[in-house]
Amino acid sequence: MSKQTFTTTFAGKPLVVEVGQVAKQANGATVVRYGESTVLTAAVMSKKMATGDFFPLQVNYEEKMYAAGKFPGGFMKREGRPSTDATLTARLIDRPIRPMFAEGFRNEVQVINTVLSYDENASAPMAAMFGSSLALSISDIPFNGPIAGVQVGYIDGEFIINPDKEQMEASLLELTVAGSKEAINMVESGAKELSEDIMLEALLKGHQAIQELIAFQEQIVAVVGKEKAEVELLQVDADLQADIVAKYNAQLQKAVQVEEKKAREAATEAVKEMVKAEYEERYAEDENLATIMRDVAEILEQMEHAEVRRLITEDKIRPDGRKIDEIRPLDAVVDFLPKVHGSGLFTRGQTQALSVLTLAPMGETQIIDGLAPEYKKSFLHHYNFPQYSVGETGRYGAAGRREIGHGALGERALEQVLPSLEEFPYAIRLVAEVLESNGSSSQASICAGTLALMAGGVPIKAPVAGIAMGLISDGTNYTVLTDIQGLEDHFGDMDFKVAGTREGITALQMDIKIAGITPQILEEALAQAKKARFEILDVIEATIAEPRPELAPTAPKIDTIKIDVDKIKVVIGKGGETIDKIIAETGVKIDIDDEGNVSIYSSDQAAIDRTKEIIAGLVREAKVGEVYHAKVIRIEKFGAFVNLFDKTDALVHISEIAWTRTTNVSDVLEVGEDVDVKVIKIDEKGRVDASMKALIPRPPKPEKKEEKHD
């Protein structure tokens, strides 16, 4: 296929798609140019069905530093593991694409997005999402798209689609919404305490804008789209399914209704093992035993799936016996740990998170050097999910995509209520340790984070709580669930996380397993989430009503002084010699910004005070008219040099020593003598002249005798 180009304008910027020139061996490939951002997307599919029990979709978002005219950092000067932003963007693209493949599709699919040029005012992630959908849509991969996504901002009561960098910085909302022509299927948002009505309107505005992008994709597919390949879907043997359902459905139904998680898991596992043992023995000599046992496992999963959904939609019974809008039992604790700067333990049913606060000097901020201009990040929220939290063994190592994503969601929810750096000049790190999990652990980490911040004396604007909403839908009827647990998340159609204060929403995240959800479902879910959020805030505020007025004794204290910008080099010294000497003497940490703000951190107030004295002395300047208690340091024929303070000296000229004539300076002064002097002049080179006689009353002039005349 020869190169073909398609052009439109979207949100005020040119959107150009090129097909047929590059990556022609992929199943589908596009080059998307949005503004001056360029993203190459290639989609490929394996020829055979994978053996696992899940759909192996991999989406990558690769940031090439040359795209922004930068050299990669580090010794190797080569791109390494994806940045946090790249990982989050890959997840952002994966989530709306995944539901658009058929049930039972098991061929491995990879969608690789490579940023070739970067324009900070034209969203490369949105170009990559568009390119991912289009590459799949024009390929022979059986993808039920297209989908598209947009960013939505909110400034002065107006919604802005795909805002530029300056607009996003001024926006009260940072929303990414994706979906198909029919419905929304992915949401990711941070917001400055906006109401449910505004958030819902933003979602609908975003979905409206998506229609334009989907129509553009459909035009392109009509011209260059390939015929979809016929692939084998995972389908179980119908006779085998009927046999197992008839024999064991009643037993499995009973097991599913056991309320306690571990007991329920044991009961369902016992039924499954009994079924597997029977059929493994029955077909032991069959050459297709592996396929049969795979079908048995899939049938049992489908039976459990169907029963959980039936109980909720028909009987209005949840696996743990709760009502549809009921929250699990809550518990909140502060000061769980000694010595640390703040800690909070939050428990919701069988989900429990411990959050630990650490405060540090601003020098500890994280430097982010990606495609965007380098910046410093002063608030970090890290989320850890050890396998023991679900009673299992597993891999331990660096944080995976899920942990990075959950940490970022908590960070987005909490950063909206943090004080400004002017009010609270600290780097803040929260670490959430999930100790138990039965669903909604990311939201538990937000609640625990609020407790830790308030216990640690961080003056947040308001406490934040989070809740996860679920959905069971048969296409016609639906049920929205409050505070979903693991089983409801696994077998349900939606995981809709909502975090916020009493004033409004600070973060949203929605993932679904169906093609999309309607505005009515969104509105109902937001309303139920608000009610639940207020219930959780009641528990948090009963534990700790407001941030403590003081930091923990172990937290670094801070004091700030202002110096002239031209004195920064004096405090730092050649090669950092002066500031290193101060730190070595006092044991403090010192940060100096480009505007001359000097922040001094230490748990010892005396050390802070001593450091302030030293710095004040270093930057102190002599002023004309001021009097100093000086020390004579050198004597010359023409006068004496005196030290006013620290490294500032002055010349007392011989004529400025006394009102009477001084013949020899050494007759009047000696080295080491203390004298009071007044500064009388500072020249353009900074040289200081001082006077001793200016502090002495001038003697009266002698009266002239009258001459007698003869």
From Swiss-Prot:
Residue ranges of every copy of the S1 motif domain listed in the record: 625-693
Keywords linked to the UniProt accession: Cytoplasm, Magnesium, Metal-binding, Nucleotidyltransferase, RNA-binding, Transferase
Keyword GTP-binding annotated: no
GO BP terms, alphabetized: mRNA catabolic process; RNA processing
Enzyme class: transferase
Residue span, KH domain: 556-615
Annotated stretches, region: Disordered: 691-710
Subcellular location: Cytoplasm
Substrates-to-products reaction catalysed: RNA(n+1) + phosphate = RNA(n) + a ribonucleoside 5'-diphosphate
Swiss-Prot/TrEMBL cofactor(s): Mg(2+)
Protein residues bound to Mg(2+): D489, D495
Comp. bias intervals (Basic and acidic residues): 700-710
Entry's Gene Ontology molecular function annotations: 3'-5'-RNA exonuclease activity; magnesium ion binding; polyribonucleotide nucleotidyltransferase activity; RNA binding
EC number: 2.7.7.8
GO cellular component terms, A-Z: cytosol
Signal sequence segment: none
InterPro entries found in the cross-reference section: ExoRNase_PH_dom1, ExoRNase_PH_dom2, ExoRNase_PH_dom2_sf, KH_dom, KH_dom_type_1, KH_dom_type_1_sf, NA-bd_OB-fold, PNPase
Family label: Belongs to the polyribonucleotide nucleotidyltransferase family.
Function: Involved in mRNA degradation. Catalyzes the phosphorolysis of single-stranded polyribonucleotides processively in the 3'- to 5'-direction.
Protein name per UniProt: Polyribonucleotide nucleotidyltransferase
